[in-house]
A protein has these predicted regions:
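C-terminal cap of metal-dependent C-N hydrolases
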Residues: 9, 323, 377-443
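Histidine/acidic residue-rich metal-binding segments in metalloenzymes
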Residues: 134-308
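Metal-associated gating/positioning segment near the N- to mid-region
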Residues: 50-117
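His/Asp/Glu-enriched, well-ordered alpha-helical/loop segment
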Residues: 201-222, 226-231, 301-308, 313-389
Length: 446
C-alpha cells in the first residue's frame, strides 16, 4: 500500500482555509488532518508543502484539444501535459473535432484514444446537430459529461439553428446541455455590413462589433427560455457581456437548473488589447469592452457566475493572422488559467475560497462528478499545490501546448503551481510532467 503524507499545507476547501495535512493512500485521500495531527499509520513518502496553498485539482469544463483530426495544432497528450502543469487534473473536451463527436462511434473512439494519451482525467461532450436529437436519450449518462449545443456557428460549424430541432434537443437531452450562445442571423447581418464598409477582412478590432453583445444576449435569452419550457438543465458557456448577467439568478448552485460559465480570456482581456495582441485574442464569443470585463469580474464574487473555465482552443500562430474574418477563433489557455485567476485573487476581485468554488467544487457539483473536486476522505487524490509568493514572467519557452504560444506571453504572475497530483500520483513537480502517467475517465452520478 502506497501512503503519502503532504504536511504543513494551507488547505483551501469548502469555503475554509486552514493549516493542516493530507494523507493519500494509493489513489484516494485517506485522511484530512488538523495542523498538529499526525497520520494514523506510517507513510512511505512525506512531502513538505512549506505553507503553500493545497487545493483540489482544477476541473476545466470547457476545452478543445483538437483530437482527432486537427492534431497539427494540439492533441490529447500535449494539452493534458499543459493541463497538469497548470494544476488542472480533469478536463471535458468539446465535440468540434474531425470527425465531429456526433455519433456513438466517434464518442467511443475518443474515450479509447484518451485512455492511451491523457495524463489527467477526462470526459467528452456529445455534439447536438440538426439530425441527431433522437440519439441523445441513448447516451450513457454515467460516462458522458454533457450535450454540447452550438446556437452560434464557430470553429467546426456545428450550428443548430432550426427551432423544432432546438426544442427537441432541450426535451431529449436528459443531462446537462452546455450551450454556445450567439445568434447567427445577427452575426451574419453584421458581417455583411462590415464587409461592405471595410472590405472582405475588416480589422480585428471590429470582431466584437461583428460578433456583438446583441447576438450573445439574444441567443442566451432564447436558450434560457427553451430550458425553462422543457425543465432542462442548461449551462451557458463563456458569458461575455454585462447584459447576460441579468439573465441569471444569484442563488447557490444547488438551487439552480440554469447556470453560467465565464472564461479566463473574457475575465482577463478587453477590446483595447486587440491593438497589441491582434488575432491572438480572437475568440468566439468575442472579447468585448472594459465595462463587460469589469462586470464579469464583479460577478465572480457572487453566484451569478458559477464556473470559471478556459475554452482552451489552440491554433497555430499563422492561423491567427488576418483580420476579424480571416483570423481563426480560439487561444490556448489551460496552462495558465489557475495562476491567472490567482492574480484576480491578489487584486481583491474574488477570494481564494471563491476561486476554489468556481474552478474545483462547482464543476464537480454541476456535472455530478463522482468523488472529485473536493478534499474529502474517500475522494480521488486530485490536488494542486500553489506557491502564493513566487513572481515570474511567462515566456514562449515555457509553453507546453503543441501550438507553442500563449496570449499570456510577457504576463507577470505572482503565484506558481508547484505540484499537481492526479489520482494520488505526483504528475507535475519541479517544472516537469510525468509523461508516462495516464488519467482516468470521469464518472458521473446521475
Amino acid at each position: 500500500m502506497k501512503r503519502t503524507w503532504i504536511k504543513n499545507a494551507r488547505i483551501v476547501n469548502e469555503g475554509k482555509i486552514f493549516h493542516g495535512s493530507i494523507v493519500i493512500e494509493n489513489e484516494v485521500i485517506a485522511e484530512v488532518l488538523a495542523e498538529e495531527t499526525v497520520p494514523s499509520q506510517p507513510c512511505g513518502e512525506i512531502i513538505d508543502a512549506k505553507g503553500y496553498y493545497l487545493m483540489p485539482g482544477v476541473i476545466d469544463d470547457h476545452v478543445h484539444f483538437r483530437d482527432p483530426g486537427l492534431t497539427h495544432k494540439a492533441d490529447i497528450h500535449t494539452e493534458s501535459t499543459a493541463a497538469a502543469a497548470g494544476g488542472v487534473t480533469s478536463f471535458m473536451d468539446m465535440p468540434n473535432t474531425t470527425p465531429q463527436t456526433t455519433t456513438l462511434e466517434a464518442l467511443n473512439a475518443k474515450f479509447a484514444d484518451a485512455a492511451t494519451k491523457s495524463i489527467v482525467n477526462y470526459s467528452f461532450y456529445f455534439g447536438a446537430t440538426n439530425t441527431n436529437a433522437d440519439v441523445l436519450p441513448t447516451l450513457d449518462k454515467s460516462r458522458v459529461c454533457g450535450v454540447k449545443l452550438f446556437m452560434g456557428a464557430s470553429t467546426g460549424n456545428m450550428l443548430v439553428d432550426r427551432m423544432e430541432v432546438l426544442r427537441k434537443v432541450f426535451a431529449n437531452a436528459g443531462m446537462l446541455i452546455a450551450a454556445h450562445c450567439e445568434e447567427q442571423s445577427i452575426i451574419s447581418a453584421n458581417t455583411t455590413a462590415f464587409k461592405e464598409k471595410y472590405g472582405e477582412d475588416p480589422d480585428i478590432k471590429y470582431h466584437p462589433q461583428i460578433r456583438s453583445a446583441e447576438a450573445c444576449v439574444y441567443s442566451s435569452s432564447l436558450a434560457i427560455r427553451l430550458a425553462k419550457e422543457n425543465n432542462a438543465r442548461l449551462h451557458i458557456l463563456h458569458i461575455s457581456t454585462a447584459q447576460e448577467l441579468d439573465l441569471f439568478e444569484d442563488n447557490p448552485l444547488s438551487e439552480k437548473k440554469i447556470t453560467a460559465e465565464a472564461c479566463v480570456s473574457h475575465l482577463y482581456f478587453y477590446d483595447k488589447d486587440y491593438e497589441t495582441l491582434k488575432g491572438r485574442i480572437k475568440c468566439n464569443p468575442s472579447i468585448k469592452t472594459s465595462e463587460d470585463r469589469n462586470a464579469l469580474r464583479k460577478a465572480l464574487s457572487t453566484n451569478l457566475i458559477d464556473v470559471i473555465g478556459t475554452d482552451h482552443a489552440p491554433h497555430l500562430l499563422k492561423e491567427k493572422e488576418g483580420g476579424a474574418l480571416k483570423a481563426v477563433s480560439g487561444m490556448p489557455m489551460i496552462q495558465f488559467s489557475l495562476v491567472a485567476i490567482m492574480e484576480l485573487v491578489r487584486e481583491g476581485i474574488l477570494s481564494i475560497e471563491q476561486l476554489v468554488q468556481k474552478m474545483c467544487h462547482a464543476p464537480a457539483e454541476l456535472y455530478h462528478i463522482e468523488r472529485r473536486g473536493y478534499i474529502r476522505p474517500g475522494y480521488q487524490a486530485d490536488l494542486v499545490l500553489v506557491n502564493p509568493d513566487h513572481e515570474w514572467t511567462v515566456t514562449a519557452d515555457c509553453v507546453l501546448s503543441k501550438c507553442g504560444w500563449t496570449p499570456m506571453e510577457g504576463q507577470k504572475f505572482h503565484t506558481r503551481v508547484e505540484k499537481t497530483f492526479v489520482n494520488g500520483d505526483l504528475v507535475y513537480s519541479d517544472n516537469k510532467v510525468d509523461q508516462s502517467h495516464r488519467g482516468q475517465e470521469l464518472r458521473f452520478k446521475r
